[in-house]
């Protein structure tokens, strides 16, 4: 399905439901009530859908969280913030998440949203090895299904499951 048609459909639906659409760019802050997100990208000078991916940074309960959208290596920030939780860019593509970026962000937990047996081979071995080299614990939706993180003053608790939490639950705790 054509991505531009999906966007047009979403905009039409938002208009129909009277939902306001706002454009964010680097330097903006988004307040959702529970969290305040710093918008790190897109930068105005970037072109292309992936290059203009929304990149958000927030902190909660002492945990630093960086969400990178589909940001390619060519558009990575020169000085990315250190983070405890990283949503890995572009499903772990070879065109995203450089070794240098990971050395600067040093995530403890890396989340990869990716479909099982996808035709692109995501996530790539290079990205998985780079995440391993910085000591990140990797959670992948193709292997674990839904990934839920709970943040508390005691640390981060992760639960993953494909079907039901009672049958396939895996819990892990981290202290940032």
Name every feature range the model reports, one short phrase each.
Residues 1-176:
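Non-globular, low-confidence helical/coil segments that flank catalytic cores
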């Amino acid at each position: 399905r054509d991505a531009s048609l999906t966007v047009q459909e979403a905009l039409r639906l938002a208009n129909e439901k009277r939902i306001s659409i706002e454009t964010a760019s680097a330097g903006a802050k988004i307040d959702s009530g529970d969290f305040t997100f710093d918008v790190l990208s897109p930068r105005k000078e970037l072109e292309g859908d992936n290059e203009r991916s929304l990149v958000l940074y927030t902190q909660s309960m002492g945990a630093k969280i960086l969400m990178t959208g589909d940001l390619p290596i060519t558009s990575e920030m020169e000085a990315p913030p250190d983070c405890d939780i990283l949503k890995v860019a572009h499903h772990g593509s070879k065109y995203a998440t450089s070794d240098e970026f990971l050395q600067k962000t040093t995530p403890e937990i890396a989340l990869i949203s990716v479909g099982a047996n996808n035709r692109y081979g995501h996530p790539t071995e290079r990205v998985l090895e780079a995440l391993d080299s910085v000591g990140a614990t990797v959670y992948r939706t193709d292997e674990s299904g839904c990934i839920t993180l709970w943040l508390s003053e005691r640390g981060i608790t992760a639960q993953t499951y494909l079907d039901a939490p009672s049958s396939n639950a895996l819990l892990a705790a981290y202290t940032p």
